[in-house]
A protein has these predicted regions:
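Conserved phosphate-coordination/catalytic loops
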Residues: 32, 72, 266-269
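Catalytic histidine-centered segment of alpha/beta-hydrolase-like enzymes
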Residues: 259-272
């Protein structure tokens, strides 16, 4: 399936890909990826919907945030930018750090979110606490959550070695790393090899303490829009669903079989099918 996307720069300087027509869908990627993480999913969605895949401030090809990297602030920046392009309520889809942003977005602007989808992520302040020492199979998936928060050291160790870091992450966090194409790997390295780009990505992790406090406050009111929570079988599995059942009224989801963390790239047809079926039911119920 092919669907041509066009490049777009939103009012806040965020880089985006846009395709299709119909009810609006916004796709938010995580780190160390970009809007292109949705390349394989976007054609399926754009056949029925008006789709915007956007790089959050400081990630991918977007400009830096001028208001910090806590997800409460980032989500407000994206809401302001997206609202001018898509004034109607949106289906919001998110992955990894993008899900941190999307949860805060939905909590602050519930009237704007027609449905919320979270893909393989653990929300700061709301995910179950881990005890030390972490089991090796857990540590290999989560170590960067602590490493990326450290001052200065991540930049010292990764400058000029962005490719080596990303290749390690893809190899160890994916069930099917080869499904992340070489062209996309090259694109991600190009994005994050630019001056200051890695620091901007690390800033999301360095602000997780602030984001966590915001999330704890947001969680006092359950989300009321339909929520789809999906984890890769060797990633979050059904733990994301169980977590979201405490945070939202109408939740469904589970685990994507034969899949790791990078769900859109590893199992694009499964993810697309689940999303389209979910959107259709939501729209039918709301019509």
């Amino acid at each position: 399936m092919t669907q041509t996307s066009q490049l777009l720069t939103l009012g806040n300087g965020s880089h985006a890909l846009v395709a299709g027509s119909g009810t609006p869908v916004v796709l938010v990627p995580g780190w160390p990826e970009s809007a292109r993480a949705y390349d394989e999913v976007l054609p399926f969605l754009a056949a029925r919907h008006h789709v915007l895949a956007v790089d959050p401030p400081g990630l991918g090809d977007s400009v830096e945030s001028t208001q910090g990297y806590d997800t409460g602030s980032i989500s407000r920046q994206l809401e302001d930018a997206v609202r001018s392009f898509m004034p109607q309520p949106i289906h919001l889809v998110s992955h990894d750090v993008g899900a941190w942003i999307a949860y805060a977005w939905a909590a602050q602007f519930p009237e704007r979110i027609r449905s919320l989808t979270l893909l393989d992520s653990a929300l700061p302040g709301l995910a179950p606490l881990q005890s030390f020492p972490l089991p090796p199979e857990v540590n290999v998936k989560l170590w960067q959550l602590c490493f990326n928060t450290l001052p200065e050291l991540p930049e010292v160790l990764t400058q000029g070695r962005e490719r080596e870091l990303f290749e390690w992450l893809f190899q160890h966090k994916a069930q099917h790393p080869k499904r992340i194409t070489q062209a996309k790997r090259d694109h991600y390295v190009e994005c994050y090899s630019k001056p200051g780009a890695m620091s901007r990505g690390f800033a999301y992790y360095r602000d997780t303490a602030k984001s966590a406090l915001q999330n704890i406050e947001f969680a006092k009111t359950k989300l009321e829009m339909p929520v789809l929570a999906l984890g890769g079988e060797i990633g979050m599995g059904d733990r994301l669903l169980k977590s979201m059942e405490l945070l939202a009224v109408h939740v469904e989801g589970g685990s994507i079989e034969d899949c790791g963390h990078y769900v859109m790239e590893e199992q694009p047809e499964v993810v697309s099918s689940r999303l389209l079926e979910f959107f259709e039911r939501v729209e039918s119920a709301q019509s």
